[in-house]
C-alpha cells in the first residue's frame, strides 16, 4: 500500500510517534497518542469524539492511545477514551466504541463491532464479523 498523504487530517494536539504511516482520507482527532511503528491504513478515524461533542461547546476529547507496532486497517473507526496495547491489529471496517481497553497483541477481525465499555487482556483474538455488546464481560 502506498501512503500518499492525501486528505490526512491530524489534530494539533495529537502525538504521533516515530515511523508512523497514515493512509489517505484518515482523521486523527484531539488527544490521540500514536506510539512508534504504527500503520493506519486509508479511510480511518482515530479518536472519534463522543456524543457530547455535538451538544457541549466546552467538550474536550478524552485521550486515545494506540500502542507501538500496531496496524489499523482501512475503514476502521476507533472512538475516543480507548486504549490499545502494543501489537494491536484490526481487520478492515472495524468499529470500536468509547471506553474500550485492549491489552498487548490483540487482534480484531474484519467487520467486527465492539460497542464499548469493555476490557480485554493480552493476546485476545476476535475473528471476523464479531459483535461485542456494551459492557460485556
Predicted region positions:
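Intrinsically disordered, low-complexity Ser/Thr- and acidic-rich flexible linkers and loops
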Residues: 51-61
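Basic/polar N-terminal segments that are highly enriched at the extreme N-terminus
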Residues: 1-2
Amino acid at each position: 500500500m502506498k501512503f500518499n498523504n492525501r486528505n490526512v487530517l491530524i489534530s494539533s494536539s495529537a502525538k504521533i510517534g516515530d515511523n508512523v504511516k497514515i493512509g489517505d482520507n484518515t482523521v486523527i482527532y484531539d488527544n490521540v497518542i500514536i506510539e512508534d511503528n504504527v500503520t493506519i491504513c486509508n479511510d480511518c478515524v482515530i479518536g472519534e469524539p463522543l456524543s457530547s461533542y455535538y451538544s457541549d461547546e466546552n467538550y474536550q476529547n478524552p485521550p486515545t492511545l494506540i500502542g507501538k507496532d500496531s496496524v489499523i486497517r482501512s475503514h476502521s473507526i476507533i472512538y475516543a477514551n480507548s486504549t490499545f496495547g502494543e501489537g494491536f491489529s484490526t481487520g478492515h471496517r472495524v468499529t470500536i466504541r468509547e471506553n474500550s481497553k485492549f491489552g498487548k497483541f490483540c487482534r480484531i477481525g474484519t467487520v467486527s463491532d465492539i460497542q464499548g465499555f469493555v476490557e480485554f487482556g493480552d493476546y485476545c483474538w476476535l475473528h471476523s464479523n464479531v459483535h461485542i455488546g456494551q459492557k460485556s464481560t
